């Protein structure tokens, strides 16, 4: 079962969306970290929707951030937990992209 990703978005400047840019943040960050790039990029891509999902899991050790999957050498999770988390994140992102 896929998890629904919470997103932040910036609509196209023209009001007519013909393309989309999806920003994926890194470990411990959140959607807002990258969505600010929409302003300078939007001037050059006026028909583009900019969207940034938050990763589905709260980041261990960084309570205001999110993670797509655990990273063993950072959070002491196991390789198995990391691989399961990565596969779940891939499924979540595929469902998210299919719904755009």
Locations of regions flagged by a protein language model:
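Serine-hydrolase catalytic machinery in alpha/beta-hydrolase-like enzymes
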Residues: 2-100
């Amino acid at each position: 079962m896929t998890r629904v990703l919470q997103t932040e978005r910036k609509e196209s400047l023209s009001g007519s969306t013909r393309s989309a840019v999806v920003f994926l943040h890194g470990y411990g960050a959140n959607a807002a970290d990258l969505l600010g790039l929409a302003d300078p990029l939007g001037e050059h891509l006026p028909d583009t929707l900019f969207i940034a999902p938050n990763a589905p899991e709260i980041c261990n050790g960084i309570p205001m951030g999110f993670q797509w999957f655990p990273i063993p050498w950072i959070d002491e999770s196991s390789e198995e937990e990391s691989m399961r988390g990565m596969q779940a994140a891939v499924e979540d992102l595929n469902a998210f992209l299919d719904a755009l």
